[in-house]
Amino acid sequence: MPPMLWLLLHFAAPALGFYFSISCPSGKQCQQALLSGNDILLYCNSSGAHWYYLFTQGKKGRLTSLTNISNMEIMPEGSLLIKDPLPSQTGLYHCWNKNGRQVVQYEIDFQDVTTLHITHKDLGQRPLQNETLHLGSKQLIFTWWEPWQDCNRCEEPGECKRLGYRYIEEPLEEAMPCWLYLGEVLVWSSRLRPELQVEACHVQCTNNTQLRVDYVIFDNFRLDEKTEFVWLDCPLGSMYRPVNWRANDTPLTWESQLSGQDFTTFLDPSTGGRQLQVFQPAVYKCFVQQELVAQFKPAASLETLEAQWRENDAQWREARKALRGRADSVLKGLKLVLLVVTVLALLGALLKCIHPSPGRRSTQVLVVK
């Protein structure tokens, strides 16, 4: 992606204003599976809060004050923003208020989004099956599905998606997100993968899902000369929100991509379609929660500018010819009017000589020889 476009896009999202967040009741401990590579806000309503963490993968450690991790930021109101989280950052996150009392505790499993298994129900594609793991006793590996997200379009056919996380359950115990359960145990399985499932939808429009934000226009994207493609990034788009792209007002769908019908664009599964790879110039629009948030116009190429200049020059020449023709017609018309006025003036003078004005008597002289 061109540096300037990347910069604009990444400054646009904070300006527009919010990240997807999860919350936990004050004083409680909450367990949650999420996806790596997708920004998340861990809510803690305590101004001046301090955060402590313990990553559970790798060697044992202890709670450490969160001060210098590059992709984490404590927000003014106390919440913790984690940008592009890594699978290795799976672990415990504690929020303490400025008086040294724990406010909330999160146990987060950042499951590896690069191994995402994506399926479309309308194409007959099947999600991952359950599997048995043997670690001293039998553990069941299964997918825990989140509710379906809202349809990404309304009043016309759209698509909706849902996320699935791999959980492990053993007899008489509650199920846990797999990597929180495994901790330091190194296990490989082709079924220890998060899932994304898509299906068609058709709903009426409501105001309940709208973001109510102004949209942004970017009008200078170019395809890379070497790779011949560019990545577009939809502000406010997220794996956790419904996203929809259109190319010249034609919807881009997961169904077309997963069935191999569309090779001009590529919706990135690891971002839930927030990022779009394009291989040809067009006007691209992205919608989040059914609302337009950004429009991308291609920068004009040198050939296009030259063609436009030639077209404008030809139009100017034609306009000048037409103007010159109209000017000649007007001049001829003026000459004709002037001739008519002159003739009428002469006729008027002649009539005055032939018929004197009433009330004035003429002197007549009779000559007799």
Curated annotation (Swiss-Prot):
<feature type="glycosylation site" description="N-linked (GlcNAc...) asparagine">
    <location>
        <position position="45"/>
    </location>
</feature>
<comment type="similarity">
    <text>Belongs to the FAM187 family.</text>
</comment>
<keyword id="KW-0325">Glycoprotein</keyword>
<dbReference type="InterPro" id="IPR013783">
    <property type="entry name" value="Ig-like_fold"/>
</dbReference>
<dbReference type="InterPro" id="IPR036179">
    <property type="entry name" value="Ig-like_dom_sf"/>
</dbReference>
<feature type="glycosylation site" description="N-linked (GlcNAc...) asparagine">
    <location>
        <position position="130"/>
    </location>
</feature>
<dbReference type="InterPro" id="IPR039311">
    <property type="entry name" value="FAM187A/B"/>
</dbReference>
<dbReference type="GO" id="GO:0016020">
    <property type="term" value="C:membrane"/>
</dbReference>
<feature type="glycosylation site" description="N-linked (GlcNAc...) asparagine">
    <location>
        <position position="68"/>
    </location>
</feature>
<feature type="signal peptide">
    <location>
        <begin position="1"/>
        <end position="17"/>
    </location>
</feature>
<keyword id="KW-0812">Transmembrane</keyword>
<keyword id="KW-1133">Transmembrane helix</keyword>
<feature type="transmembrane region" description="Helical">
    <location>
        <begin position="336"/>
        <end position="356"/>
    </location>
</feature>
<protein>
    <recommendedName>
        <fullName>Protein FAM187B</fullName>
    </recommendedName>
</protein>
<feature type="topological domain" description="Cytoplasmic">
    <location>
        <begin position="357"/>
        <end position="369"/>
    </location>
</feature>
<keyword id="KW-0732">Signal</keyword>
<feature type="topological domain" description="Extracellular">
    <location>
        <begin position="18"/>
        <end position="335"/>
    </location>
</feature>
<keyword id="KW-0472">Membrane</keyword>
